[in-house]
Every structure is written in structure tokens, then in C-alpha cells.
Regions:
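Acidic, low-complexity, intrinsically disordered interaction modules
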Residues: 19-83
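Short terminal alpha-helical segments
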Residues: 3-27
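The feature captures the hydrophobic core positions of alpha-helical coiled-coils
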Residues: 6, 82-85, 89-92
Length: 92
């Protein structure tokens, strides 16, 4: 993979990993859109070392993913994948 592809894979994995965190629940308030609720859930994680800033397209991608799959995301495997991608980036 190229450096750009690795950065994008890392960014995507981090989105899934932090979205799946149980400390912050996805709560949709009355009159609130799903996109706004996902933005609010992800906001605390924005400074967690993402390769690039979280964008509206990222939030839309999370909204279009299977939430059932994201809520059953394996955090341990995700952390391992993130570490692997970070190591690959460092070795470039």
C-alpha cells in the first residue's frame, strides 16, 4: 500500500474503533438528525491522533455502515489493526 492508502486505512479503522467505544453512547435527541448524533458521539475522539481531521463524509460513512456490525466491533482486534497500520506507516 502507498502512504496515502495506509493513512486512509488507519483513519477508517480509527473511525470504527472510536465509534464502537462504549464510554460514549449514540443518543439521538428529539428533533436531531442521525448525522448530528454521530458527530456528537465522535467529537470527544477528534484529538486522538487521526491521520487527518474527521470530515462530514466520514460521519456519513459511519451513518451508512451497519450499526449492528459497528456495535459488535472487536475493540481488541481494532486496536491491534491500528497499531499494525501505524507501524507500517512508520516503516515507510
Amino acid at each position: 500500500m502507498t502512504k496515502d492508502e495506509l493513512c486512509e486505512a488507519l483513519h477508517r479503522e480509527m473511525l470504527f474503533y472510536y465509534f464502537a467505544q462504549r464510554e460514549t453512547r449514540l443518543e439521538i435527541r428529539t428533533g436531531e438528525s442521525l448525522i448530528s448524533a454521530v458527530w456528537r458521539k465522535m467529537k470527544p475522539y477528534a484529538d486522538c491522533g487521526f491521520p487527518r481531521p474527521i470530515t462530514e463524509a466520514d460521519i456519513e460513512m459511519l451513518c451508512n455502515c451497519s450499526f449492528a456490525g459497528l456495535f459488535h466491533y472487536d475493540l481488541e482486534k481494532g486496536a491491534e489493526r491500528i497499531a499494525q497500520l501505524e507501524q507500517e506507516l512508520k516503516s515507510l
